[in-house]
């Protein structure tokens, strides 16, 4: 997949505000601060396309980006951030689970996992949820450049143990660009 253009389309906080256009949607999901927005900026070669922050929980809406005028990349709020109040967590959880389980135009979910913490219960639960919904998904191990060689192998092995139906596992570094071409090839399969 070659990304020729990428633009922000809209942010939504409710299911009834989702785009009516039925373009294929590739959804990016993961824990807070795993690097979803950074990955989107890296993939599209647009540094400020998705807002990034070192503060967990910055993305609080479903953010849509139009890619090549033929599909959407969708940046979801991160899960697992402890400092968000319980009411907000519940609302996010309800919105996101309804969106992921019922949205017909989702062609792929990309589960981002911090390679430094590959065995988090919340990531296990998300992989289980995606498998339960029957959603095709792939895994991207983020911040891969921060690991030593032995830790890289251990991280991949840990993720393989619970993401049994994952279509792919890509090691990714937004800094070096490692994994970018491989991930774009995988995404091309699901964008029609």
From Swiss-Prot:
GO terms under biological process: division septum assembly
Residues binding Mg(2+), per UniProt:
37, 59
- Output the InterPro entries linked to this UniProt entry: G_ENGB_dom (IPR030393), GTP-bd (IPR006073), GTP-bd_ribosome_bio_YsxC (IPR019987), P-loop_NTPase (IPR027417)
The UniProt annotation places GTP binding at: 30-37, 57-61, 75-78, 142-145, 172-174
Question: Which Pfam families did the record assign?
Answer: MMR_HSR1 (PF01926)
* HAMAP family for the chain: GTPase_EngB
Record domain EngB-type G: where: 22-192
Gene Ontology cellular-component terms listed: cytosol
Per its UniProt record, the required cofactor names are:
Mg(2+)
Q: What is the protein name given in its UniProt record? A: Probable GTP-binding protein EngB
Keyword Cell cycle among record annotations: yes
State the protein's purpose.
Answer: Necessary for normal cell division and for the maintenance of normal septation.
Q: Which PANTHER family match?
A: ENGB-TYPE G DOMAIN-CONTAINING PROTEIN, MSS1/TRME-RELATED GTP-BINDING PROTEIN
Q: Which UniProt keywords apply?
A: Cell cycle, Cell division, GTP-binding, Magnesium, Metal-binding, Nucleotide-binding, Septation
Q: Which family does it belong to?
A: Belongs to the TRAFAC class TrmE-Era-EngA-EngB-Septin-like GTPase superfamily. EngB GTPase family.
The molecular function terms of the Gene Ontology recorded here are: GTP binding; metal ion binding
